Curated annotation (Swiss-Prot):
It is an enzyme of class 6 (ligase). It comes from the Bacteria. One of its GO terms (cellular component) is cytoplasm. CDD domains: HisRS-like_core, HisRS_anticodon. This is Histidine--tRNA ligase. It comes from Chromohalobacter salexigens (strain ATCC BAA-138 / DSM 3043 / CIP 106854 / NCIMB 13768 / 1H11). It catalyses: tRNA(His) + L-histidine + ATP = L-histidyl-tRNA(His) + AMP + diphosphate + H(+). Its EC number is 6.1.1.21. PANTHER family: HISTIDINE--TRNA LIGASE, MITOCHONDRIAL-RELATED (PTHR43707:SF1), HISTIDYL-TRNA SYNTHETASE (PTHR43707). Keywords: Aminoacyl-tRNA synthetase, ATP-binding, Cytoplasm, Ligase, Nucleotide-binding, Protein biosynthesis. The gene is hisS. One of its GO terms (biological process) is histidyl-tRNA aminoacylation.
Length: 428
């Protein structure tokens, strides 16, 4: 039996061949957030369990079944964060970020849920979250959707995703709708599965999220939340859809879109795709105007969304939308034959990095034959191998070998090498 220690199920290593694609995605995010005036916030991965029970809701699947919760040595109940919004609100309140001011914040990092691992979904997964506080109108909801749409454009994903919208209304409207929904489900109790019967008393709106095909027809005929909206929420939603129409952003109103977290109110939205099978949501969010007060602050409107990084990278790779330039590999691999050449190669490498800061250069270490070094240069993916040996040192030159083209080798004077490489790398 092997005594190797392996990664925990559902918690994966991000290997060197994968990380350049993540870095490409993260660069797109950082650039976009700067353009829209959002500031990054970083919160701990561990929080008091009470934070999530109070915000997400004690009778949600996340709190009941999925959280990683334990007691520390002081007997305090701690939880690995299952999502980022509650932590963001907690940090903003604790540090006075919401006092008489608006805030636009974003974050990225690992989240943890004890779910069944499946394609693109893991127990440790990464999210990018975007949150805005202190703005009550539909214009900030619109900005959230515009921001996410601009990201899809930048990544080439816009033709492959669909925006779904709904409004959950005010808490009073939801209470009235809840009563109508419970009455309807009780009248169709024989169709409900065991999970839905349990939710009937705790969280009946979540029954609408069921994927049970035996319940599909009954759910399709269920009362619609849109028919129970208060006037203010209806006006808010109509203004939002008018803005989307004016911007030319297509959307579908999905009356069964309720979101899995208790803190949402009014606008909720999801971006979905058909390209990843049945688990098609890649980004989701909405308003949570009561959450700040729920966590001990003054009444403060909030809206935000989160996207799963693993899901989006899987989507990019499935659709072959990762630019070749995003897959990191050296432009140039510098080989060195002999001890003197090895020392000289290190110094030459530093000189070239100073002269050509955008060039990716890898210097061979560890010796070996000329053949083995060229083989490693080729395997690295570099376009060009530089060759430095005793003869080149004596003549003050460097050999250039083209690894991806059928071209004659060149010999270039050391002082002209940077200029020659710059010209070669500029070629298509």
């Amino acid at each position: 039996m092997s005594n190797k220690i392996q990664a925990i199920r559902g918690m994966n290593d991000l290997l060197p061949e994968q990380s350049p694609v993540w870095q490409y995605f993260e660069r797109q995010i950082q650039h976009l957030m700067q353009r829209y005036g959002y500031n990054e916030i970083r919160t701990p991965i561990l929080e008091q369990t009470a934070l999530f029970k109070r915000s997400i809701g004690e009778v949600t699947d996340i709190v009941e079944k999925e959280m990683y919760t334990f007691e520390d040595r002081n007997g305090d109940s701690l939880t690995l964060r299952p999502e980022g919004t509650a932590s963001c609100v907690r940090a903003a309140l604790e540090n006075g970020l919401l006092y008489n001011q608006t805030q636009r914040l974003w974050y990225q990092g690992p989240m943890f849920r004890h779910e069944r691992p499946q394609k693109g979904r893991y127990r440790q997964f990464h999210q990018v979250g975007v949150e805005a506080y202190g703005m009550l109108g539909p214009d900030i909801d619109f900005e959230m959707i515009l921001l996410s749409a601009r990201l899809w454009d930048a990544l080439g994903l816009m033709p492959h995703v669909r925006l779904e919208l709904n409004s959950l209304g005010s808490s009073e409207a939801r209470a009235a709708y809840r009563d109508a929904l419970v009455a309807y489900f009780e009248a169709h109790a024989e169709v409900l599965d065991e999970d839905s019967r349990r939710r009937l008393t705790s969280n009946p709106l979540r029954i609408l999220d069921s994927k049970n095909p035996d319940m599909a027809e009954m759910l399709e005929a269920a009362p619609r939340l849109m028919d129970h909206l208060d006037d203010e929420s209806r006006a808010h939603f109509e203004q939002l859809t008018a803005m989307l129409d004016a911007a030319g952003i297509d959307y579908v109103i999905n009356p069964r879109l309720v979101r899995g977290l208790d803190y949402y109110s009014r606008t909720v939205f999801e971006w979905t795709t058909q390209a990843l099978g049945s688990q098609g949501t890649v980004c989701a969010g909405g308003r949570y105007d009561g959450l700040v007060e729920q966590l001990g602050g003054k009444p403060t409107p909030g809206v935000g969304f989160a996207m799963g990084v693993e899901r989006l990278i899987l989507l990019l790779e499935t659709l072959d939308l990762v630019p070749e330039a995003a897959r990191s590999r050296p432009d140039v691999y510098l080989t060195a034959m002999g001890d003197t050449a090895s020392r000289e190669a290190m110094l030459l490498g530093e000189h070239l990095r100073d002269a050509l800061p955008e060039m990716h250069l890898q210097v061979h270490c560890g010796g070996g034959s000329f053949k083995s070094q060229i083989k490693k240069a080729d395997k690295s993916g570099a376009r060009i191998a530089l060759m430095l040996g005793d003869d080149e040192i004596a003549s003050g030159s460097v050999g250039i070998k083209f690894l991806r083209e059928d071209r004659e080798q060149e010999s270039v004077a050391r002082e002209a090498l940077a200029a020659r490489l710059q010209a070669l790398l500029a070629e298509d």
